[in-house]
Amino acid sequence: MSTVTFFNPYLCGPRKPRAPSAGEGGAEGAAAARARAASAPFLQIVPRGCLYDGERGLLKHNCALAPRMFFRDRPYVLSKDLVWPTLPPPAVPASTTERAPRAPAPSADLLFHMYDQAETVVSADSKELIHPGYRHRITPCGVVLRLFGRTADGASLCVNVFGQDAYFYCRYGDAQSLHDRLYRLSDTLELAPVFHVRVRRVQRCSIYGYGTRPFADLYLVACGNWHVLKKMGQCLLDEGVEVFEVGVSPLTRFLLDKKIPSFGWCRLRRWHARPAHGRLSTAELEVDCEVADVRGVDDVAWPLYRCLSFDIECLSGGGAFPVAENLDDVVIQISCVCYPVGGTEEQRAAFPVAERHLFTLGPCAPIPGVLVYEFPSEFELLCGFFTFFGRYAPEFVTGYNINNFDWRYLLTRAERVYRWPVAEYTRLRFGGRFCAYVPGGGGRQPGFRTAQTKVLITGTVVLDLYPVCMAKVSAPDYKLNTVCELYLGRQKEDLSYKELPRAFLSGDAGRARVGRYCVQDAVLVKELFEKLNYHYEAAAVARLARISLRKVIFEGQQIRIYTCLLEEAAARQMVVPTFRSGAQRGAATGAGGGGGEETTYQGATVFEPTVGYHHAPVAVFDFASLYPSIIMAHNLCYSTWLRDDPGTPARPPETPARPPETPAAGPSGAAHAGGVPGATFRTPFRTPAGVPAAAAGGVGAGPPGGGAVSSASVGGRAAVSPSETPAEREPEPAPEDVFVVHVGQGVSYRFVRENVRASILSELLRRWLAQRRAVREAMRECEDETRRLLLDKEQLALKVTCNAFYGFTGFSQGMLPCLPVAASITTIGRDMLSRTSAYIEAHFAEPAFLARFFEPGDLPRADEPPPTVRVIYGDTDSVFVRFGGVRAGAIVARGEDLAAAVTEALFTEPVKLEFEKLFVALMMICKKRYIGRVFGSDALVMKGVDLVRKTACRFVKTVVRDVVELVFRDAAVAEAATRMSELTLEEMRRVGVPAGFHVLLQRLARARDDLFSGRVETAALVLSSVLSQDVSRYKQLNLPHLAVIRRLAARSEELPSVGDRVSYVLTAGPPDGRANAPNYELAEDPDYVAAHRVPIHAAKYFEQVVKAVTNTLYPVFPRGVVRRDRFLADLVPKRVYLGDEFKRHARPVEEEVCESERGGSGLLSSLDSSR
């Protein structure tokens, strides 16, 4: 019998089994025989079309042979020992069963770049081959941090860091009572008995509120079992005990306490290399070290990392959109694009891996430039892809919507359909995580997450470009095709999911066509990845905030500021309080009593604008980094806020005081007394024989400046004191050292000035803004493009993080809300804007002031009206100033000097007013809506108009843009618009429509003709709305985009995900339908409309055109007109449009010219209805 007992009957016709050649990757040698013997039977599912061209359906049968693939007509057994035929051979054995020479003893420091981390809890009975010198760190259990990266010479690396404890802080009466309480919690929570708790007294004060000295009853609670510690801290919090920094992971403690960059270079002083047969990871080098042996290195350069872009194609057994849980909805192809990221140009040019790969079911015709791997069944296809993934071992994985679809689909098929674990394909041979999940049940929480689905792969960073593009670009929809057109300037060759099955089942050539489409998507994502460079931006944020790269990607803004506060608080011997979720609102309000009423605060100021079409120059001045500058200028912070209830601890008012508790006796029955250190190390396990007590209860890595081991009681105090004594509080500062902010409604907040206590927020902002200035200066001097890009992303990360401080304090459901700080910031901002406006109107028009900044030729002559200066609008951090009679070029030349004069007169550093731009013409529509032409540019700046709104269709935007261009470019139209805005309706009745305005009316008439004549393509009529939550959670169901989703579901088509923009078109509806049917009855999927030639509702679209133009030209219409849209519609010449059934009987006639087109007033007789 031949050694090859199986070949794929679906790839080729009958053929003779070929004996494998020696050394071939697919040879059935000893490793392959072991794999076949050990492999369990699996279900083979393959489309019938792979065997019989054009046939539908699936073939299913159980197979007892080892899974395999075919590459270039050679079979390869998919085993753990497989050397992938197109990848460089691994530097270390693929399996721990093959031993490699032991690594030499380290003779120097080990320099490496870290990109990812994982934290695990390892017990003393672990099967890991751990160096004896680190065994005491995991007795009975301990945290081991896995740091993944690459060495300076490019070798992949896994560093196992021992000795980092997780800990939190807690106020309690004495250490023994606290320890006994924690011991009892272990039984209450049914926690695993393998843990060890250590308690010691420390000297810290709270960051929340000024005035408290270090607590006399504050204890640090540390434990080697991070999961146990987190639950115990939460239980204490729920029981009313005042706790601090609960939930801070040991990885975060490591990064903060040791000042380690979460994405950057590190150095190991001492380390021990693991032999190949004892490695837990698949890295080329694996070492063990103590937490104290790791040092950070200040360098932003990247080594060469591997990146993978992929895309999948699926085939539904029932013809509907594929659902992973359905057995018959199989994965048919997976494309992979491998490419380098980081490193030098020479390193990227020498990247040893081929770029394009395709994994396909069944035989496939060759595709130029693509390596094609063929598989007999879906299970083997998945096995091949994950094997390739493990062998290639990318540090970064990207794609488009891979979190919500591709990864979830692949993992569901592998784990639920085939019961096949995939965690072994991570960077850890066991104990790794390879999963996709939706935190918190799938609902979005603003400020916390930037993506709905999280994908966690140990040792690999997943960067989905779909949420990145949604955050960075404004588009009508976020399909890959649309985004590629915006960023790359080209579209992809599209293949709908309805065409795809026919092409795939048609034969080898059809599968090659599908393969080209699949590879094309992965290539486009690769180009988007390199265009956006979001990985550099995210890495810069990770370094700044000392959080992992995956937290930057998935966790939003709150965690970034929180970790920065943790680090700064620790440097000042402060602790950050933890609030119960129900008490977050109370923390945010800052209320002094126990009242349950919610306190709110007023937001930023928006001045009522002077609506109109302004021909005079309008200068825009704005404050540089308004909210950060307010924090720095006025020393605002949690730590400088003077609470009005000095006798109350710094906790939310809704958090109850800790219940009194007397010192409890230990389990042995003897009450603890005295200062015996061993008494605080009471554990629910027996010390193993031969292990010293100190080793079993090692202190590990504690926080900086740790305190002494506590005694059983503190000065004879009760176990819990409900508030600080007067001796524990700072003396009340002098009145001149207090800054008071009156926020309105009789509410005031007080903050101490910088000479009393420097604000933590101010210190962070000053440091980061100074760092940003230094980085931008380095950018100007940098000639290396790669380094310049890295520096640019670093300064952007600094800017974004600085601007996030206000939102961090003002979000009531955030991690550390504080209404006194947030309300004070907005109050001061409103006052600054008002004072700026008053100063400008009081001084800018004075002759002496103008003479300081302008030449006589820039101002009106003596026989002309004097110059006028008036503030016509103000919004949050900017003011719009209209200059009458001043030359525009002179205002631009002296704009910065004018802004500096205001800053010098009104404000102190670092507050700074800046000159932003000058409009030579501005149409102020209403608050937050305007259009203007900037001096020295032909471009129009628009805000809030339908032209820039995502909900408007392209056709409406085109018409509005044409109208705006006419108003700003055509002198006759501009003059007519100005004239019309000065008239009343009665005056217009007498004189008629200004002649130049008819050009605009003709454009609207042409738009109406295009709609009713069917000359507008469907793509230009697409409207869209965001699916903000699951359909079942909407209370109002008669919305157009929800109606479209229901229609898609009824046709078993692809459904959008939460957060997607749902596109739709308004159709004409049934012939016997209502004339004014609501939009949700007419909404339909654009692809369906285009495919079935469904007529559109021309009247509704023209109504949208008229309303959009009316909203844009709001200031132009005569005074006294109430229904402006109706007024404009009546001005457009009337026409009658015949239906198709009448057109064959119609005779062409000369089109009549309406009276209004000749400048007469005959049309105005019908305008009474618009009043």
Curated annotation (Swiss-Prot):
<dbReference type="GO" id="GO:0000166">
    <property type="term" value="F:nucleotide binding"/>
</dbReference>
<dbReference type="Pfam" id="PF00136">
    <property type="entry name" value="DNA_pol_B"/>
</dbReference>
<feature type="region of interest" description="Disordered">
    <location>
        <begin position="647"/>
        <end position="687"/>
    </location>
</feature>
<dbReference type="InterPro" id="IPR012337">
    <property type="entry name" value="RNaseH-like_sf"/>
</dbReference>
<dbReference type="InterPro" id="IPR017964">
    <property type="entry name" value="DNA-dir_DNA_pol_B_CS"/>
</dbReference>
<feature type="compositionally biased region" description="Low complexity">
    <location>
        <begin position="663"/>
        <end position="674"/>
    </location>
</feature>
<feature type="compositionally biased region" description="Basic and acidic residues">
    <location>
        <begin position="1149"/>
        <end position="1158"/>
    </location>
</feature>
<dbReference type="InterPro" id="IPR023211">
    <property type="entry name" value="DNA_pol_palm_dom_sf"/>
</dbReference>
<feature type="compositionally biased region" description="Pro residues">
    <location>
        <begin position="649"/>
        <end position="662"/>
    </location>
</feature>
<feature type="region of interest" description="Disordered">
    <location>
        <begin position="704"/>
        <end position="735"/>
    </location>
</feature>
<dbReference type="GO" id="GO:0042025">
    <property type="term" value="C:host cell nucleus"/>
</dbReference>
<protein>
    <recommendedName>
        <fullName>DNA polymerase catalytic subunit</fullName>
        <ecNumber>2.7.7.7</ecNumber>
    </recommendedName>
</protein>
<comment type="similarity">
    <text>Belongs to the DNA polymerase type-B family.</text>
</comment>
<keyword id="KW-0808">Transferase</keyword>
<dbReference type="GO" id="GO:0003677">
    <property type="term" value="F:DNA binding"/>
</dbReference>
<dbReference type="InterPro" id="IPR006134">
    <property type="entry name" value="DNA-dir_DNA_pol_B_multi_dom"/>
</dbReference>
<keyword id="KW-0239">DNA-directed DNA polymerase</keyword>
<dbReference type="InterPro" id="IPR043502">
    <property type="entry name" value="DNA/RNA_pol_sf"/>
</dbReference>
<keyword id="KW-1048">Host nucleus</keyword>
<feature type="region of interest" description="Disordered">
    <location>
        <begin position="1149"/>
        <end position="1171"/>
    </location>
</feature>
<dbReference type="Pfam" id="PF03104">
    <property type="entry name" value="DNA_pol_B_exo1"/>
</dbReference>
<dbReference type="InterPro" id="IPR036397">
    <property type="entry name" value="RNaseH_sf"/>
</dbReference>
<keyword id="KW-0548">Nucleotidyltransferase</keyword>
<keyword id="KW-0238">DNA-binding</keyword>
<dbReference type="InterPro" id="IPR050240">
    <property type="entry name" value="DNA_pol_type-B"/>
</dbReference>
<dbReference type="InterPro" id="IPR042087">
    <property type="entry name" value="DNA_pol_B_thumb"/>
</dbReference>
<feature type="compositionally biased region" description="Low complexity">
    <location>
        <begin position="709"/>
        <end position="725"/>
    </location>
</feature>
<dbReference type="InterPro" id="IPR006172">
    <property type="entry name" value="DNA-dir_DNA_pol_B"/>
</dbReference>
<keyword id="KW-1194">Viral DNA replication</keyword>
<dbReference type="GO" id="GO:0006261">
    <property type="term" value="P:DNA-templated DNA replication"/>
</dbReference>
<dbReference type="InterPro" id="IPR006133">
    <property type="entry name" value="DNA-dir_DNA_pol_B_exonuc"/>
</dbReference>
<keyword id="KW-0235">DNA replication</keyword>
<dbReference type="GO" id="GO:0003887">
    <property type="term" value="F:DNA-directed DNA polymerase activity"/>
</dbReference>
<dbReference type="GO" id="GO:0039693">
    <property type="term" value="P:viral DNA genome replication"/>
</dbReference>
